[in-house]
Amino acid sequence: MKKGAVERNFRKIKNQIPQIEEIVQHTKTNALWEHEVSVRKKIRHLKEFENDGLRDFKSVYEQYLEILEYISERLVDEYNRKNGTNFSFKEIVKHNYDSYLGSGIISVLITKHIPKLVSKEFDNVFPANPKDEYEHARKLIRKFYLHLGETNTGKTYNAMQRLKQAKKGVYLSPLRILALENYERLNSEGVKCSLMTGEEEIIVEGAQHISCTIEKLDVNEEYDIVIIDEIQMINDDQRGAAWTRALLGLNCKEIHICGAINSKELLIDIIEDCQDQYEFKEYKRSIPLVMEYGSFSRKSIQDGDALVVFSKKRVLELAYYYGSLGIKASLIYGDLPPEVRRKQYEQFINKETKILVTTDAIGMGVNLPIRRIIFMNVKKFDGSQVRFLNSQEVKQIAGRAGRKGIYDIGYVASYGGTQEFINEMINVRDRTIEEAVIGPSEVILKIKSLPLREKLALWSTREEKMYFYRKMDISEYIIVLDKIKGYKLDEKTEWTLLKIPFDVSNPTMMDAFLTYVDELFIAHSDVISKPTCLIKDLNELELYYQKINLYYSFSKIFNLEFDEQWVYDERMVVSEDINKILLNI
């Protein structure tokens, strides 16, 4: 990273100290978990600047350590109060300081009173090398075809041509909308294909192909050909384990991997460690990408432009602004249901709308006829802090500009004098992805000496022996387990509840989730209640859509009777309502 970018990031982290101190001092102890995770991430981020000669580095780093210590002491006090113990912060971190910074005080605390027997159980259940969890795959000599390169270069298209020739194949997607798109494409081209995502299942009679979100992969099933899309997600702290599981566990002799070039070295390391074979093909743009060096003016908008911002609020603000000028826009952002995204895409493709206003959700998914990508901002909130975009993010978004046969040159512009930064990010070499994220598998339930929460915490602190793997962030698992602790459920049920996809950080969704836990395990109901929506504004409708998905996922995972047709019909009604609101902006 260039020195200017380093200094900007450092200054941003430094300036956040007073606000963070104020917040944690006035936060109830049981709500400190998210702050603890966020502060540890900032400490790790600061550590990267250690040798950059920054003034005040030592002082800022020590202040963050003091904040973490304050939070950790309160968490230990709360643990002692709940469990009748008398652990001290200093005792816990005395010989475990690196683990404390890496996984948090409570995770380290739990390892202090784990007997050696339990450690041996972990060794027996979890092999030293994650690849050895997948015995079926290790008996095969698999061949990987690496389709790696820039955005919008036909990587997935070429792999799909091969998939169509298979007797039995799977397309593994990062997004429901991509799984849906390829499910429809295969069926329209005469290849019978079923659809499986966390939100729906459409089983086509006689189909031997499946298009699914990657978390739905059955690694015990045999396939002829598989496509793993957007492989760079293997480095994602929350979801990356699903890509690693597919890479290591697929029971398939021909596997096509599509994604960014900066994953190449890691993939080769893992493939060679599995004693499998590979071929590599790099993809480069056939359509040139041209940077505009004049700062973009909002009045200079043109047909086919896509304006990129990093919050739903900014998407709506810009859409209202251009709507007031008589310029209709399609809108794309993370909370938008896939059905609505699709309608918005179609309106843009069919020129019913002139421009696109979008978040970085556009970086993955459908290729659109975009003439020019315009960065209206160069910072985003990543879940823990507001930071500058990295080079891979800029390239992924900028690469959406240009469409063969429609726009034979793709243009990139930016707002607010940020052209140099965008140009630098486009031309700089991406940071190499060095680690694949791994998650705990269900075999953890075989360990009987500890509750599931403590086992997961211990798992997260155990050092990986292979240098190209790291543990996933289990903080969401811990939050859910803390919320359901009072129900006294068996571990198998707890594990199943952890696999239900919903926004754990959203209090309304957590309340809906706990209501279903109540209905099933306290009231012992055979069915759970359908969600309702009384206020039909944009935010409430989007939340209602998420509740419908939760109703579906909860019912499906526990094999409950539920009104599946109502789910599909109600989703369509909600999507229509949302789309009407967006059309009137």
Regions of interest found by a model, annotated:
Residues 177-182, 186-222:
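Inter-Walker segment of RecA-like/P-loop motor cores
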Residues 149, 205-225, 348-367:
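Conserved two-lobed SF2 helicase motor
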Residues 139-158:
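Walker A/P-loop
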